[in-house]
Swiss-Prot record:
Record-annotated membrane-spanning stretches: 10-30, 53-73
Gene name tied to this protein: atpE
This protein's record includes keyword DNA-binding: no
Record bears the keyword Cell division: no
Main location: membrane
Note in the entry: Dicyclohexylcarbodiimide (DCDD) binding to the active aspartate residue inhibits ATPase in vitro.
GO molecular function terms noted in the UniProt entry: lipid binding; proton-transporting ATP synthase activity, rotational mechanism
Lineage: Bacteria, Pseudomonadati, Pseudomonadota, Gammaproteobacteria, Vibrionales
Name of the protein this chain belongs to: ATP synthase subunit c
Residues annotated as signal peptide: none
């Protein structure tokens, strides 16, 4: 039982960490490409900005889903009931 809970805690840490890391890398690439495109064609900057904010909103969903899964493993672990 203790090993299951400790492995669940490790899994929660990995889920939250990787979700945050992936989002940070995604935001860095998104911002860099936006600045690159706006510098190359300044007249396209407003259209690129709208698309950038849409993609940024979708990128924010990744850590939110990871947090929900981590909270599920933390407070309502589905594997504890299978121990019998």
């Amino acid at each position: 039982m203790e090993t299951l809970l400790s492995f669940s805690a490790i899994a929660v840490g990995i889920i939250v960490g990787l979700a945050s890391l992936g989002t940070a890398i995604g935001f860095a690439l998104l911002g860099g490409k936006f600045l690159e495109g706006a510098a190359r064609q300044p007249e396209m900057a407003p259209m690129l900005q709208v698309k950038m904010f849409i993609i940024a909103g979708l990128l924010d969903a990744v850590p939110m889903i990871g947090i929900v899964i981590a909270l599920l493993f933390t407070f309502a672990n589905p594997f504890v009931g299978q121990l019998g």
